[in-house]
Each structure stands twice: as structure tokens, then as C-alpha cells.
């Protein structure tokens, strides 16, 4: 308790939400706020995140699927209608287009009569980690760092209560990072950002503490909650050291490690999903038990996220978990209950020492941006993820219901699976397209073009782009127009995949050896080495699964072709034809499989590749899996299919069947 005997204030409670349309998302937000949620966390759809309007060919199949589509100021007005932005704390998970979405938000507040200085919230804006994990980057690292820097400089002056960046270790853990890598990579990114702001000369040295004070972090918390809690204390210690020693920030309040958290969605299972509830609770303890390292904001995933899009009731359940812990227990009545624990202190010391060593290695490479451009960080994550997968497959790392205690009674919550998840209406895309076209038709076109011309000129002149972006928002410019203008100046970027021939992750099982021998025998029978194209169609940048399939396919003896993320069906077909592949493995997590996968299959057949096997992996409901099989997909794999070697065996069987060969003995 505080000195007056009162309980500590709880953290900000959010649920990560947004889908279909601004109007539907607005209704969801208002319902959640009535239920006691104390902040908003906005999920945007992939076209919005990657800078495309709903009517762009690149947006096909993606509109409204994983978040809300925001194409213009009108959409942002609808999203926050009836929600006073002078009192709301809003977190926006947005990166490459963060400057633009913030501009739309600030102008919406302006129209509500709210001064920009009153805004409270966070833009994720950690474009650096997008090259390593989520994949929603647009521009090369240099221009991306400029956008981050420009926004930080602007908000320090004009929105002092806004967190202009959330350095994200969350996605690094999902991409495979160990706790040491999570700390070191995130801290190296923070150093790159702070160095850029300092070196810009836009913030006087005596005010640099204000920059540091608005830096925030977004972290992950896994089920090993003792180690995870020690990780958070290690973050606190290293951040305090870096900001004092490197940047000379003497005010302890400005050096405070401020972070929000979502617990580990990657660890949620499709099999026995009811077990996810206790996983979520245990993971939350990692970021709440230790007062000295407690999260300032928490959002919990829903129990059924491995099955599909959660319903409002599922999100309410996650909110109630937070409320029970904060309001029914005595958690907030005590000082740090782990202070002086030799076990915790030993864990923290080990993590701090190893993280410092890794940070020093990255610094020797030239810092985080250089370590990304060289492929070092990405290859380290792919390697660590492959090792984690190998531990799960061998049973060394236990996942209850998946590789141990698999016997189960029928789950009544899944009796009607279609009702257990929310489905986005197919008309959402049509409505969004009509909306953005109507918006363009009614705006002052000359004002919009003038604003875009200023944006173009400022980008070329190395002027801070925030003012021009605000002008664009007021003039009715669209998301795609803003991003396309900068694409023409900065160019687009394709990040290293991290998939290398040297990665084997210690996998040397009898099962893998048998599959490898069968792959080689099949190739000999067909007179060629079997070729496997791993493909990521659409705008889905979550490449972790695709990378692990590429690694295991190579270990199993296939010649692997993997060109990275964000490909059109036409590009995938062209690659399959050029490389004369035997298998096209499509990885897709955005819910756009019903639109994009049939387009790939049809393209392959039109190109005469009738014997090429198509398999699909992702979060795909049973009804959709049947839909895909009816359209020529040989096999569909979902999160329950955790054994990558078994997947390779099944793929080989499909190849042999397509070529008229009997199943291989293994």
C-alpha cells in the first residue's frame, strides 16, 4: 500500500480489438469501456498497416480481417465517435504507417475540440522489429528510422503525454527469441532510436530526458513465469543503466522502465484450448507479481485465438481475468514481495550479464540497423525458434494437451465450432471500397494534391514529416496515397529471411532420417531432386511458421525456395513455374485463405502445373479447410500439427500420390 494505507492503482486494462469496419469496432470499444476496460488497444487490418487503400489490388482478401480498416479521416472519425479523446488512453498497434495513423487521430481529436497536448496513448512505431517478426514494414531501415525520429521529436514538443514509440520485445519472443535475445535485441533497438533522435540535433541536450521519459516498451510474458519475472527486472536494471550512462539522464523518474504487455499468444494451443485460460493467468503473474517491475498496461489474448477471431464474450472473459486479479486479490497491497530473494536476484544477474554481452556484440556490428541489414538478428531468431520447435517435438518442452496428457473429454465450448469464433462478413471489403471511393469523390481534390506535394517535397528535403502528414489528414488524403508518396521517395524493402542451409537446430531423429531417405528415393524415382516452394501470399507478415517449414523441408532433403513475405498469387505462380517445383506450401495467418489460396491453385493449373501439390498451413477453421480441399488443396495443417517432421512425411505422401507412386515406407 502507499503511505496513506491505500491500495496501489491498478494497471491500464485493455483488450486488443478491431475488426470489420470502423462502425463495428466503435461499437465494440464502447461496450468494452462500459464493462470496465480502462484503455483502448486498436488492431488495424493489414492494408492499413502496410499502406494500401481497400481498393488496391494488394488489399484483396485482407480488408477488415485482422483489424479495422482505416483509409481516411472519415474512418477515424467513425472509429472514435462518442469516445472523448481528451480522457481516453489509446494504444495503436501500428508501425510503418504510425505517423499517418497518429496524424488522423490527432486531427480527429482536433475536430472534437481537444488540443494535441492533451492526448494520451501510444503508437507502437517500432518499425525496426518489423524486419524481424511481424513483417509490416514498407520502407528500408534508414527512412523508417527517420519516420520514428520525426514522430518522437514532434510529440515531445506537441503531445508530451503521448508515447511515440513502443519498443517491442513481444514479437521477438514469438519469432523465437530467448529471454537474453529478447532483452538484448529490444535494448539495441532502443539505443538505435535514441541515438537517431540525439544525433538529429532537434532536441536540446537539456531536454533529452523528456525523450527518454516517453519511451515505452511492449513485452511478452511466457508460461515460465518465474524466469519471465526475472526478465522484467533485468529490463528495468539495464534500461536504468543505459539511460543514465549513455544519455546522461539524471532524473530517476525519466529513467523508469515503462512497459505494457500482452501475454504469449504463440503459446496458446488449438488442441484442448480450454488449457489456454490457465496459461493466460500464469503468464499474467509474471508482469504483475513484482511491484518494482510491474506492467503499466496489460492486454490479454482470448482463450480461443488459436482457433480464429475471438468474439466479444471471449474478450470480456480476458478482461475479467485482469479485474479479478486487480480487485479481488491482495496483490496491490504490498511492496515488492521478491525483494531480497537470492533465487530471483541470481536469475536477474545471469540475464543481465548475458544480455550485456549480446548487446556488445550487436554494437560491434554497427548497432541494431546494421545487425538487421546483415541478416544477423533474423538468422539468430530463426535458429532459436528451430531449437524451440525441436524441444517441443522431442517432448523435452512439455505442452499439456499437445505432447503430454493428450487424452481428453469432448469440449462443450467447441460443440459448435463455427459459433466459437467470430467470422468477418464478406461484404466488409465491398463496403470499405465503396467508402474510400466516395471519400475521394467528395473531398477538395486540389487541397489533397497540394498536401501530398508538400509531403513529397518535405521527404526529399529531409524536413520533419509530421507537419506535412497532419496537413494530409486535414486535406482528406488516404492511407494508400500517403504511403505511395513516400514509397516513390524512399523505395520499398525486402528483409533477409534468416533461412540458411546451415540451420539444423540439432534435429537428428530417426523419423527425420527416414523422411529424408524417402525424399531422396522419390527424387531418384522421378529423376530430379524434389523442390518445395514455401509461399506467403497477401499482406500477412507473420513468417515464423513459414521459416520453420522451410528449415525442416531443407533438413528433410527438399530443395527449398523461399522468397519471403507479401507476394501476390501471380508472383507465387510465376516462382513455382520458374523453379519447376513439386510442392507449393502456403502459409497464411490473416484469415484471407479463402480468397488467396484458390487464386494460387487456379494459377498453377492454368500454367499447366497439374502435378504440383499445394498444401496450406495457418489458423484455418474446419469448414474452411474443407472449402480449400474442394478447390484442389491436398492437405491443410493448423496449429495442432506441431510436428514439422510428420508434416514433411505427409507432404511427401501427397507428392508421390500426385505422381502415381505408392506411399513410401518409413
Regions found by a protein language model. Name each.
Residues 5-13, 54-64, 85, 129-135, ...:
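Gly-rich Lys/Arg/Thr-decorated short loops/hinges at beta-loop-alpha junctions or inter-strand turns
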Residues 36, 72, 113, 239, ...:
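Conserved, mostly hydrophobic/aromatic
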Residues 60-65, 90, 129-139, 172-176, ...:
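Short beta-alpha connecting loops at secondary-structure transitions
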Residues 311-312, 316-323, 327-514, 577, ...:
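Flexible, glycine-rich loop/tail regions that form catalytic "lids" or insertion modules at the edges
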Residues 546-652, 656:
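Cofactor-cradling patches in redox/metallo enzymes
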Residues 652-666:
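The C-terminal output helix
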